[in-house]
Each structure stands twice: as structure tokens, then as C-alpha cells.
């Protein structure tokens, strides 16, 4: 199911700090909640698991497909925690899954930014937003029509 938070925003073209842009962007799209307070002993959002997962692994190595076990070990957390954050990014259509050969020769599912490029991945997100907005418009029109019919029958 596609899910994304959409808020009015200004492009951050004048900001040169990738971490500032990332933190703002990730809050705006709903990946990180506004006022996010890490549940662990992390000192800041940038030390948190969801932020490091996105920036230090998915964005810093966009061509690599990461397994959940790799990410859990690197981030020193549990597999369910990794899945929770992976699923949130998948719901925004920002990630793709690929088969990955592990060191022991097994094939596992790995995740990376779609096409290894956030800009290209975002085009999928935009397409989903357009479709969702069109469906909302149709639903609003249907509600208006049904309400008008009900008023005429009264």
C-alpha cells in the first residue's frame, strides 16, 4: 500500500549540508516523525537507526542491495526494527528488492534505493501521488453527487 505524507515545503536548493537536507526531507515525507525522539540512547536524529539506515547505507552506497541481516548487524539492532524502517520506505516506493548472494552462498532479499538513484526513485513516488490525488478527486466528485441526490430527495 502506497503511503506518503505530503506537506507544503520549499526546495532546499540553497542548503549545502546533506544532513540538514536529509533530515528535513525525511521528516517532510513522513519517514521520520516531526519532533522525532530516538527511542535508544542516541543523542540526535542523525544518530538514530532510521536516519543512519537511510543515509549511511542506502544513500552512501546506492548501488548495493543490503540484506536485513547485514543492516541489523551494522546498525546493532534487531531484524524487526530494520524491517519496520524498510517497510516504511517501501510504502513510499523508494526501495526495490533484489536477490543477493550471501557469504555462505545463500540467496537472500536485499534492498536498495530504487534504480540506485533517489531522483529516479522519487519519480515513482510522484506517479503514486498523482494517482492517489486523481482518485481523491473522483471520490470527492462522487460524494458531492451523492449528497446532491440525497438533498433533492428530501
Task: Give names to the regions the model predicted.
Residues 1-44, 48:
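N-terminal leader segment of winged-helix/HTH proteins
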Residues 45-50, 100-125:
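Short, cationic-aromatic polyanion-contact patches
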Residues 45-67:
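Short helix->loop/beta-hairpin flanking segments within DNA-binding domains
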Residues 55-58, 87, 141:
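Surface-exposed alpha-helical segments enriched in charged/polar residues
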Residues 65-75:
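A short alpha-helical element within helix-turn-helix/winged-helix DNA-binding domains
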Residues 76-91:
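Short amphipathic alpha-helical interaction segments
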Residues 90-102:
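A short, conserved structural fragment
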Amino acid at each position: 500500500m502506497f503511503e506518503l505524507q505530503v506537506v507544503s515545503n520549499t526546495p532546499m536548493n540553497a542548503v549545502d549540508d546533506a544532513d540538514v537536507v536529509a533530515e528535513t526531507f525525511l521528516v517532510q515525507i513522513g519517514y521520520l516523525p516531526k519532533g522525532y525522539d530516538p527511542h535508544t540512547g542516541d543523542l540526535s536524529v542523525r544518530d538514530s537507526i532510521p536516519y543512519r539506515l537511510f543515509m549511511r547505507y542506502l544513500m552512501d552506497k546506492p548501488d548495493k542491495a543490503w540484506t536485513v541481516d547485514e543492516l541489523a548487524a551494522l546498525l546493532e539492532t534487531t531484524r524487526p526494527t530494520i524491517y519496520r524502517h524498510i517497510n516504511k520506505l517501501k510504502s513510499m516506493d523508494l526501495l526495490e528488492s533484489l536477490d543477493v548472494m550471501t557469504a555462505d552462498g545463500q540467496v537472500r532479499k536485499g534492498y536498495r534505493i530504487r534504480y540506485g538513484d533517489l531522483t529516479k526513485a522519487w519519480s515513482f513516488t510522484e506517479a503514486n501521488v498523482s494517482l492517489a490525488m486523481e482518485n481523491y478527486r473522483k471520490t470527492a466528485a462522487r460524494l458531492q453527487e451523492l449528497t446532491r441526490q440525497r438533498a433533492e430527495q428530501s
